C-alpha cells in the first residue's frame, strides 16, 4: 500500500523528445549566462592583482564593499520585480546591464592607464559607482533562473537537474578566476613587455562581450514557459 501511494505521489512525466530538446535549449544557455555573470563579477579581484598600486587593498575593499551592499539590497527590489515581469526579462536585464557596466569599467581603465594619468584619476570613485551598478544587474541572475525553471521542471525532476545545473553554475568560478587570469596572460603575450595595469582592461572587456553575445542567444531562445515555446504548459506540482 505504501509503495503504491509513493508511486502515485510522484507521477511519471512522459515528456516528448521534442520537449526535452527545447527545454535543453532553454536551460543550458541560461546556465552559461549565469556562469558568465560570475566571470563579470569576480573579475575585479583578478584586475586588482594586476593593477598593483593603482588599486590598493583599501580601494578594493571600498569598491567591492559598495558592490556587495548594492547586491544584497537589490534582492529586496528585484525579487518582486522578476515575479511581475518574468524570469526571461530578468535574465536579459541582468546580462545586458552587467555587460554595459563591465564594458564601462574596461573602457575607463584603458583610458586612464593609456593617458598616463592613472595615478591622479578618481579610479576608486568611478569603479565604486560602476561596480555597484554591475552588482545591481548581477542580482537579477539567481531569481530569474528560479523563476524560469519552475515552469519547465516538475518538482519530481528538480532534484537530479539541480545537481547538473549547480555544476554548470560552479563553472562560473572557473571562468571568473582561472579564465580571467589566462586572459591577462594572453594579453601580455599579445603586447609583450606591457605592464600589468595596461592590460587589466581585458578582464572587463571580454566578459562584457560574452555577456552581450549571450544576451542575444537568450533573446532568441529563452522563454518563461513551455507554452511560449510551442509546447503545452503542464502542472509542475508546486
Language model regions located:
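Helix-loop-helix hairpin linking two adjacent transmembrane segments in secondary transporters
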Residues: 165-222
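Hydrophobic core of transmembrane alpha-helices in multi-pass small-molecule transporters
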Residues: 101, 116-140
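Extracytoplasmic
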Residues: 25-55
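C-terminal ends and interior cores of transmembrane alpha-helices
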Residues: 96-120
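Flexible cytoplasmic inter-helical loops of multi-pass small-molecule transporters
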Residues: 222-238
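Cytoplasmic helix-loop-helix junction between adjacent transmembrane helices
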Residues: 130-167
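Central cavity-lining transmembrane alpha-helices of secondary-active solute carriers
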Residues: 65-80
Amino acid at each position: 500500500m505504501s509503495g503504491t501511494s509513493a508511486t502515485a505521489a510522484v507521477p511519471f512525466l512522459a515528456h516528448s523528445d521534442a520537449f526535452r530538446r527545447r527545454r535543453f535549449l532553454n536551460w543550458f544557455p541560461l546556465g552559461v549566462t549565469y556562469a558568465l555573470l560570475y566571470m563579470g563579477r569576480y573579475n575585479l579581484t583578478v584586475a586588482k592583482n594586476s593593477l598593483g598600486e593603482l588599486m590598493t587593498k583599501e580601494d578594493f575593499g571600498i569598491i567591492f564593499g559598495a558592490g556587495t551592499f548594492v547586491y544584497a539590497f537589490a534582492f529586496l527590489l528585484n525579487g518582486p520585480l522578476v515575479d511581475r515581469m518574468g524570469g526571461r526579462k530578468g535574465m536579459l536585464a541582468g546580462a545586458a546591464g552587467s555587460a554595459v557596466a563591465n564594458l564601462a569599467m574596461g573602457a575607463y581603465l584603458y583610458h586612464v592607464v593609456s593617458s598616463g594619468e592613472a595615478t591622479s584619476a578618481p579610479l576608486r570613485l568611478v569603479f565604486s559607482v560602476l561596480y555597484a551598478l554591475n552588482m545591481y544587474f548581477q542580482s537579477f541572475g539567481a531569481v530569474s533562473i528560479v523563476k524560469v525553471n519552475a515552469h519547465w521542471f516538475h518538482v519530481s525532476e528538480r532534484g537530479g537537474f539541480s545537481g547538473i545545473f549547480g555544476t554548470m553554475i560552479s563553472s562560473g568560478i572557473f571562468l571568473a578566476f582561472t579564465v580571467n587570469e589566462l586572459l591577462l596572460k594572453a594579453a601580455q603575450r599579445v603586447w609583450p613587455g606591457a605592464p600589468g595595469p595596461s592590460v587589466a582592461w581585458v578582464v572587463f572587456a571580454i566578459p562584457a562581450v560574452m555577456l552581450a553575445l549571450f544576451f542575444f542567444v537568450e533573446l532568441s531562445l529563452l522563454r518563461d514557459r513551455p507554452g511560449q515555446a510551442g509546447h503545452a504548459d503542464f502542472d509542475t506540482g508546486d
